[in-house]
Swiss-Prot record:
Descriptive protein name: Non-reducing polyketide synthase Preu7
Residue span(s) of domain PKS/mFAS DH: 1361-1671
Domain notes: Multidomain protein; including a starter unit:ACP transacylase (SAT) that selects the starter unit; a ketosynthase (KS) that catalyzes repeated decarboxylative condensation to elongate the polyketide backbone; a malonyl-CoA:ACP transacylase (MAT) that selects and transfers the extender unit malonyl-CoA; a product template (PT) domain that controls the immediate cyclization regioselectivity of the reactive polyketide backbone; and an acyl-carrier protein (ACP) that serves as the tether of the growing and completed polyketide via its phosphopantetheinyl arm.
Organism the protein comes from: Preussia isomera
Region (C-terminal hotdog fold): 1523-1671
Product template (PT) domain as annotated region, ranges: 1357-1676
Amino acid sequence: MAWIGTHNPELLSFTPSGTSDMSIEQVNAGEIRVAFFSNEFPHDDLGNLFRQLHIHSNDRRHLLLARFIHEATSALHEEVRLLPNALRALIPPFETIFNLVDHEALRNGRLGGAINGALLCAVQLATLIGFYEDQPNGHSEDTDSVETLLAGLGIGLLSTAAVSLAPTLTHMPIAGAEVVRIAFRLGILVDRVSEHLQPRPPHDDGHGDSWAYVIPDVTAEEVQRELDEIHASEATPTASKLFLSAISQTSVTISGPPARLKHIFLVSDFFRSQRFVSLPVYAGLCHAKHIYNKDHVDSVIDTPSLEALDAASAPRIPIYSTNTGKPFPAKTSKELFHLIVEEILTQAIQWDKVVEGILTRARDVQASGCQILVFRNSLPVHDLMAGFSGLDQIKADTLELIPWISKPDQCPTVPSGTATSKIAIVGMSCRMPGGATDTEKFWQILEQGLDVHRKIPADRFDVDSHYDPEGKRLNASHTPFGCFIDEPGLFDASFFNMSPREALQTDPMQRLALVTAYEALERSGFVANRTAASNAHRVGTFYGQASDDYREVNTAQEISTYFITGGCRAFGPGRINYFFKFSGPSYSIDTACSSGLATIQIACTSLWAGDTDTAVAGGMNVLTNSDAFAGLSQGHFLTKTPNACKTWDAEADGYCRADGIVSIVMKRLEDAERDNDNIIGVILGAGTNHSADAISITHPHAGAQSYLTRQVLSQAGVDPLDVSFVEMHGTGTQAGDAQEIISVTDVFAPTKRRRTAKQPLYIGSVKANVGHGEAVAGPTALLKVLLMLQKEAIPPHVGIKNTINPGFPKDLEKRNVNIPYQKQPWPRTPGKKRIAVVNNFSAAGGNSTVLIEEPPAREHSDVVDPRSTHVVVISAKSKVSLKGNLQRMIAYLEANPDVSLPDLAYTTTARRHHHNHRVAVATSGVAHLKKQMGSYLPSVETHRPIPSTGAPPVVFTFTGQGASYRSMNLELFHHCSYFRTELLELDSLAQGQGLPSFIQALDGSHEQDYAHSPTVTQLALVCTEIALAKYWESLGVRPDAVVGHSLGEYAAMHVAGVLSANDTIFLVAQRAMMLEKNCKTGTHKMVAVRASLDEIDSVAEIASLAESRGVAGVRPFEVACINGPRDTVLSGLSKEMDEVSDILTRAGFKCISLDVAFAFHSAQTDPILDEFEAIATTGALFQPPTLPIISPLLGKVIFDERTVNANYLRRATRETVNFLAAIESAQKTSTIDETMVWIEIGPHPVCLGFAKSILPTVNAAVPSLRRGENNWQTMSQSLGTVFSSGIEVRWDEFHRSFEKHLRLLNLPTYAWNDKNYWIQYNGDWALTKGNTFYDAEKTSKAPSRVPVSAKHSSLRTSTVQHIIEETFSATACTVVMQSDLMQPDFLAAAHGHKMNGCGVVTSSIHADIAFTLGEYLMKKLKPKAKDISMNIADLVVTKGLVANKNTESPQFIQVSATTHDIEAGVVHLEWRNVVSGEALAENFATAKLHYESSGDWLKTWIPITHFVRSRIEALEGLAADGFANRLTHDMAYRLFANNLVDYAQKYRGMQSVVMYGLEAFADVALTAEKGGVWTVPPYFIDSVAHLAGFVMNVSDANDTENNFCVTPGWRSMRFAKPLIPGGRYRSYVKMIPTPEDPTVFLGDVYILQESVVIGMVGAIEFRQYPRILLNRFFSAPDDSSHLHSSTSVAKPKQTSSTTTSQAKSVPVTVPELVTATVIPTEPTPVEAAAPAATKGVTVEVKVDSDSTAAKAMALVAAEAGLELADLEDDVSFGELGIDSLMSLVIAEKFREQLGVVVNGSLFLEYPTMGDLRAWLVEYYS
């Protein structure tokens, strides 16, 4: 046999090419090899052996091993399917045959013989196959004369059959699988027959009693004689007779039913007197010829697969019979198996005969040596070695195969396919509770052992109204606690091309998934399409999400355009794919609490299946819906105590809900290593199953968890005892924690296999720190483990608040299971990897497990990067972010002054996405870099981004001769493999033409002034330029046009596609050689003159020189080059040129003699022209140009295929190079323009200066090389400039030659330009939902509430008309009043404050109600109280109360006043409308009333009085000087009425007003007129306070023509002294816009009496709205006409006594869709509504522009929630976040509001703002 040897020299044999510590030794001629297969397992840990073999099978070097395992598993599956149900049920599911080794009960049970037989064959054959695959030339079929013999015992004989039948190693998997099948079938037969002889006791999980005893020091005859006597005397049935199963010279083995074996040792004196040992034979009888017959044998081997094998293979190596000691005489496979099975079943073992047979064969062939292959040494091998020791001429030794399995790999493992790869995690990011906005802050929470639970924040919902600790109120939560992300609405909408409106309506968890995905990708160094594994078509996204809170609650309050796309789960990962342009799959997965980890498992599966090469995965959860809290409370899931999860605590009562967003980036390990990624952790295996046998769907099941864990460990080939940390699910529920600890200890710390002191197992659960993130719980746990691996520490567990759960095993310490109560070190250990398990299960029954190990250790590279200068770049999508990124980088450099500059450059260039705001610094040191970065900070605001219209065009300009040293030493040649390869290939082409090598002119072989031949010099120049051009192109910089100067034109022609590289070299060399041959050096000269040709001609001495030569009128020189307006090169005889140079120098012109051998473009070249043209005609092929060629010869641009030919080259050699005319012509034809980037291709920049002198503007101009400067410095600076101009540089190519030694740094992530996009859930409709519970609640509490009528309560005022309910205790009470707005005094008060012609219940009326109820409660609870002073605080009116038109029907409101403790001095008030006799659940106003001391108020106001008086005096001065407006009583109220509010006479208390901007004071006189019953008359309050409203609606500092302002409330209202009829006061206010929202204004109104502040309305708020909404906001509720009224703007009336300034461009707030301070009572119409956005998002609307284009721009800005300044001409609609959905909306509004009819594809046809603006101007102006 080729791979192991043969018994016949004519057959092929394995011959290794070398030896190793564990290899087949070279066997010389005449030597033999014996392979022995035992009938016992090796003494090693079987589980570990099988795990190691499984790991080897995943290696590409062991494809045959993998195939054998697969074939053997398939064979066993087939056989199991054929078993009867009763037996089949005993065998658990198994993925591979190796899984069965861990099922101890199965191997000891009834089918133990079948299972162990199959496993023994499997381990022997797998070891043999793997061993030979690992050998050098392991598949060799070279011949040798080695003779191989096979021997085995018992089942081991079956293994020998596979070896004998396999002609090559590649045949072993099929033959081996058949052996495994027959071994299993044999075991089944033996069990069935033996069961008839002695049944196994029922429910016996042990291995039972032995069926064989060995008796030493007796002969077979003695034993047989005694047995015969016993059988005869007892009349033993034949089948039950004991028999000899093995015979040797020193012992005899007897076999039979265990009971009969025991019996004979009791009844027989002979046997009682013998020593004996019971053998581990528990599966039944073999070697029993009196039991088994041919039919039995046939039943074992009669399989279709053996028939197929029989046709393909025949025995090739002799197998020695253990009965005869001779080879089996089989000719076919079937015969061989028949003989072997027959021998195992019927023949006694006589090993001595085998030893003698092998020794005889060794003597016969006169062997000089013998190598014995064994799995482990054993007694039979010892006997064989002893036999050989008696043969002096034969030296024998053994080679154990088992040690190969665990030997260290000399080479790194290469997966056999994607399915066997490990998964590397290369990037991670998060947003976690407790302010953890990144992974480092998350680690700080873990490391410090923090519990970050808190009360449910107000931005989610009002916890006070939605929480009921008693659990009686419908839809209320039983807990007020959770763990929450800070400000989950923060988002950089413009970065992700989303409009503010879309961002607002998009679920914040989906937004944060997008953000963290970017950060994780950024940290992973992901750049799309950089490598094969980063191909965008092969990247998928996988996210777990189990709730839609924001869609269900927040956006559902006002469903708009993005309700579906912003809220449905599928759009989360879909949006990530869309933004990054990933074409791989995107999955949103919901498996409840295990969603995130199950998703990561699915992502791993996608990578293993080869569906994707990179996966972005994670989980997300942001809690805003009180329903889920209520539902989980009702299901008894949630803890009621103030803590995160009390994991493993004795009092654990449920989990604490949590937010969280986690994103990770995964690749197959080999791809990650190939891509030079940072590997954070390695996933070895992952799996998901279901707790099908749990007692309920929500109840966890330890058995299912254990099964899954074992399955994952088995797949990965990991010993459970090698796992040192388990991150448990640990929700803090009694059932969950108890079940999980059972599964964990059962697998990782079993009682039967103890952990040693050096194998501690730590357990933990992150939920004790940050709560249970539900869908993100698993990724959060995984993130914790990754950080533990990174930080080399285990953080403390903080879940046990009291004592440990009593249900936990009491022997955790004995099992070495540890709970880390303090931080524990977890360092790397040489030779042993840290391995952890993340466990996760779900209330829906799912279990997910991920097995993770530490990343491979990376060796530090000592290789020094040879590049002298490096490019570090910073980019961003906005100026704010650019500044932030610069600041973060500077901070990083300050913290890491020793950072590797090459690594930093590599990370910021090749491993980052780049954006339109760019900064690039070429630097050689960190200190310089930090200084340069800092210098950019002050100019960020003026920094211009690159155009969004695309990269600028590029022109390559190729240098002519004379610009470099005679000999160069190019660093690029030495260090850049791409450039070097290009030059060497060109040099090879040159040498192939018989030309000299030009490399010596470039590689530093000579000094700089060493002069090479013109041929070498010119070839070196042109080839260097070609290589440089190719190098630039490899960096992604491709020319749009080329221009060559003189000799440089040859390189330009090649780059333009006219000449091949070979032809270019040919022409350059031929021309140079002709010059060398036909022209003398030194006779002519070229001189560069800093002057124009006209200036040169004007020099008198030049003309005189010509005359003196007798050639008057003819120049004494030739014009070689016209390079620019004042750059000219002259050629001629050396002597004449020296004279010309002297003359011009004296005339003041700078002259430089060029270092060239010949005077090109002069008469010196005439001798070569004919010959050169002829050879160019025949020797070169001219192709059409692929790029425009700017021709200095012709002074024009060449586009056609006819112009460049041999004659062109002739003329170019002789005639003038007119670079000036060429560039001017290119400019006229628009071949070049001011946006062009100029790159000089040559040894030194020359042409760039020419171009700059010719063109008025040059975008950027950079050289490739610069004389006297390190190439890397030049290239780095040039690349930085090119990159900053907008060209996308292939930085990965720039670093390719050095990447092996470069490292990706963990730099700060992107600095987001965040704004808070958040729709607030308002009210309590989640509680009520149309149910009657809360109505019934009022009824159910009726006994404690005493309905009162007039006789019970005497309280009657105009606004507080009836007390309908009241409840009083000693210190607490609730009072509910009901009033009819149609009651005359109340209605008069409302009509005294008319807006839009409607009576409006002003805030002063609400104040009177509050004062009245406050006074009533105080007198009831504390009747003796005196001097009651009340502060109405935090008044918030969410909806205006407008009086009905119909005054005949009542219009009721109810106001409740509640205090829980009057001693606390706080009363809570709520206003509600009454419909159909029932108060609405939703209030329209709220306030708090505080009982305070008026004396204390007066004291606090004393310091402010001086300031207020000084401001009043200043306003008086401004009015006196004519700067401030002084308005009379009538004028003031006429303006007020014209602009917004028409006050009744009693309200008109302001006698005069002085106003300057938004600051004013008024003299006030309160009316003495009486009418109505009030506590504080509303017209008094209004008179002293409505100055603020007057300023906001009348001042010319506001755009009152297009906007109006209303107040939703104030922070406080206090009157230290009563307002008295006829009293005189002075009011002062200054309103100030808030920084967060310029449409919201705040101010304090001070009320003075006799120059003393006696009252104050603090922080009164006004909001600005478009006047177009006035009709909608303020119309009578019972008047439907306003719904159909015109939408034209209601402008203020003009009066003759006032002047108005021109309306200014003012910022108009985009009102929130849902807000706590919205005034309107009805929804706004679409055409009049301003769009939704967040605070601070403004739109600059220039109201004085009447053009359709301007209006359209304003409409676009308003709809998208942008500023007009954002609508720059080159900005695309995609960048603004205007997608197809919004484009339809805008198109419709164009039609409705502007009369511009467009279709929905408008923004495809006109993709930028400039395009749209131009179209509108053209067609609608």
